[in-house]
Amino acid sequence: MKTGGAVQPVMDQAIFAHILFNELEGRFNGTNSEFRWEGQGWVGTDYDKLWIKSEGTLSKGAVDDGQQQFLYSRAVTTYFDLQGGLRSDIDSRPTRNWAAFGIQGLAPYFFDLELTGYVSGEGHLAAKLEASYDLLLTQRLILQPQVELNVYSKGDPARLVGAGFSDIDTGLRLRYEINRKFAPYIGVVYEGKFGQTANFARRAGDSAGDVRFVFGVRTWF
């Protein structure tokens, strides 16, 4: 039986927006310090979204490891989206552009997971794995292990990147949520380089592996 009144909008077609900075932090060891950012934002519906992702490191007055991604995503399951678009490596070294294809979502046991493959205009291949997990110690105190791993099919000496497993960035952060949208944190991270990438770093006068203490904030809106 039909009822009177206006037709209600379908909520899964409503347009929303979200911005998250998971890392806004200073990284410190005994010899030098650096500033690291990692954030992403999207606008769209429950099924279709446009994404911007940005990450990089400011060290010694120069930007390193700068990556900007512009993606479209489509929900394919309750927990995962397929993504495709462009990645640009923009920092103090020569710019590189890639086509990007991957998945993002919640893996079993609610691990945040991003797995993305890349193809450059020269036919080079790359892949990135990012994973993290929020362990609630209390309603406000949260421990987050995190890992990022990069792989390249061919070396790029101009960007100090070698073929094979290139680098890892992994850490453990303890944050306190003053409110749901703002949480300062402390932690420790390990930045490691492998193989040719480690050799490039040493020749440039950098370390192939560093343990650093971090202080930062996580925020979203």
Question: What spans do the regions from the language model cover?
Answer:
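Residue-level signature of outer-membrane beta-barrel architecture
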Residues: 43-45, 74, 105, 119, ...
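Detector for outer-membrane/organellar transmembrane beta-barrel domains
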Residues: 95-157
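Residues that define the transmembrane beta-barrel architecture of outer-membrane proteins
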Residues: 15-17, 33-37, 64-68, 95-99, ...
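Transmembrane beta-barrel strands of outer-membrane/channel proteins
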Residues: 23-26, 52-56, 84-88, 115-119, ...
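Membrane-embedded beta-strands of outer-membrane beta-barrel proteins
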Residues: 39, 70, 101, 129-131, ...
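Repeated loop/turn-to-beta-strand initiation elements of outer-membrane beta-barrel proteins
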Residues: 47-52, 78-82, 109-113, 138-143, ...
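Outer-membrane beta-barrel "beta-signal"
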Residues: 172-177, 208-221
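Outer-membrane beta-barrel initiation region
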Residues: 1-62, 66, 70-74, 213
